Every structure is written in structure tokens, then in C-alpha cells.
Amino acid sequence: RYQSNWSAFFDPIAARLVIDEGHLSADVSIMPLIANSDYRQIIETTGTVKLDPNAGDPHEESLVHWITALDMKSRTMQQAGNMAALFAPSLGLNAFGWVGQWMSVYADESPFWDEFGKAVAKDGEDGAEEFMKDNVGRLPLALNVEATNPFKLTAFLAALRAWVEQTAPGMTTWTNHEYKKQGYVKIAPAGDILEDLEDEGVEEIALYYAPSSKLLTVTLNEELLKRSLDRRLEARKLKREKKPLPKNPKPWLGKSASITVNSKLISFFDVFSRDEMTKQFRRRSWNNLPILNEWKLNLGKDDALAYHTKTWHVLLICPGGGEYVWNEKFQTYESTVFGHPGGPKTPKNPASLLKGFKRLDFGLTFEHDGLRAKGTAWKRLPNASN
């Protein structure tokens, strides 16, 4: 009855917002979700699987870490397996039979980000694009997939290699490596691909993967892979000593999907969004000028802002935090922050949405035919070391 009467308008929503000195948090529940919800595809992927608190290989040095639950029995995941088998028959009909209940993607702390930040600060988006083009092989980004069957994982990797070498012979070189008695594989370009990359000035690039009985890690950064292997060794050591594993330093807010982002990547986002936000704020600020000029020039109201407020019960505010003042030379109102179209000003402090935050956490949980979303923004407190 609810869906037939109200589905075109809204879902039933309950929300709680908490604001204190250290953080802002929101907890939103939507129950039930309508049948044609935009979240339906995500729900079909995660199914009834719930994330374990320590799933995803959580670790302190991650700058951003995203994780999602996987229901390998769901129609979506079954279709993914069938598509893989269609394109690469050697993988078999049950290509992803080794996959467990989650996958995650993370980026770790690295000098790469400091260099990237300098390129962004110097040349903005163009600098970022050029830097990524030249240094993609150093990108400290990794993919983790939980493995439940090491034998099926081994068969999958062997079939994948055979398919690659059959479809693109001589284009890749596969070599086995070892780190602290832990094996991993390096896939490097060869032949024409290698020559083309060298001609374009791209530094060495390779793909690395390390399988284990419980996890498959794939990355472009060998150092990142070694860190992952170190964590595996530490976990095995604790297990042998019958000691508990360390708790997730950045707990997942959702049991179906979660993401956590720290201050360094937040600052990058701020840089990329700053120009666009400033343009939007300037445009909104200038949108108020025509009516103020109308009151001033045609109706003779010396305090056009006060007249507008009294007449329409709406206070016109400059989104940049400035004031509206009369410019006698140009015969127009202007913002003390953005100026006016005939004499624009550059804000001393560009618009910044997330500048005051050191970490952002967000999570989704699908339960009881509905959705629960949690989000927390951790503030950067004065005199705080981090």
C-alpha cells in the first residue's frame, strides 16, 4: 500500500544529527526502500552478507579505504562470473568460486602524495593530470579480495595467465618474486607495449599480485605489496601465539559498504573543488545584485538591502561571507568579497568545504528491507597534533 500510494514522492526517512566539538555525525534510516530504489543494484551485490569489523585489511597508514560486502550467490555476482567465462573460457563457469565475502580498495601514505600535492599546488588540475600520466606506475593503490578457497584461487590465476598469454602473446612478462619467504608475481609489459611506453616517457610500470589462503592483493606499487605481506606475517604470528588481532583503527560505519578518508586526500579534494566552488559562490552572490540595483536606482531606496528584507522578509546574503555595498563609480551594488561583474574580486580565502576536517567516515547497511547510512566528519581541533 505504501509503495502504490507514495513511491513516486518519497521514502519514509528518519534522521539524527549530532554536533559536538570533535565531530559532526549523521545517522539516516530509510525503511522500507521502494521496490525500484536506486540502491537495488548495490543491495543485490551485497545481499545478506555483513562485514566483519576487521574485514578489508584495515591499517593505520591508509589514506582512503573503501570496502564492500559481496554475496557471491547473488544474481549480479553470478552474472559477473558468467561474463568472465564468456570472454575467457579458460577461467571456467565458476570463475569467481574462490571469492569470499568482501573486496576493498585502499591508498596508502607515500612520498607519491607529497609530490602529487606539489604538482597540484603549482598547476592545478593540469599539473595533477600530467603527474599521474608520468607516475601512474608508482600509484600507491591496492585491491584486496577475500579468498575462501586457495585451490580455486590458484586455478583462477593459472587460467588467467594462460588466457593473457594466448590472447596477447609476447606482450607481457611474468616473473616470480619472494619477500620474507612470501611469494608474489610481477607482470611487466614487453615487446611493442614496452617500446611504446618508453617512447612516451612513461616510467617503469608493472602489476603485482600476492595470493594467499585468505586474500588476493593486486597493486601497481611493489612497496605497497610488501607492506601488505608484512601485515599478513604479523597476523599469522599473533595467531600462532594465540593473541588477538589488532582492532580496526578506523572502524567501518556500515556493515554492507564503508569508506574512510583522511586529511591528506581531503585536502586534495579541496584543491580540486575550490575553483568550482568559488565560481558558484560568486555567481550566487552576483545574482542578488540586480534586485538591489533596482531598489536603489529606480525606487530611490538608499538602503536597498534593508528595503528588500522588509518587503519580502528575505535577507540577501553573500555566500562568501561578504557584505553588499554601493559602488558609486560603477553605479551598482557589489560584494566586498566577490565585487561585481564589471569589477570582479578574488577572495582572499577561497571557498573550502572540508578544510576544517581531518577524517571523513561513511557507511551503508542494508537491513530490514531498508537502508541505514552513517557519516562522521572529524574536526581538526586547535592545538591538536593530528
Regions found by a protein language model. Give the residues of each.
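Signature of soluble extracytoplasmic/periplasmic domains of secreted precursors
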Residues: 1-386
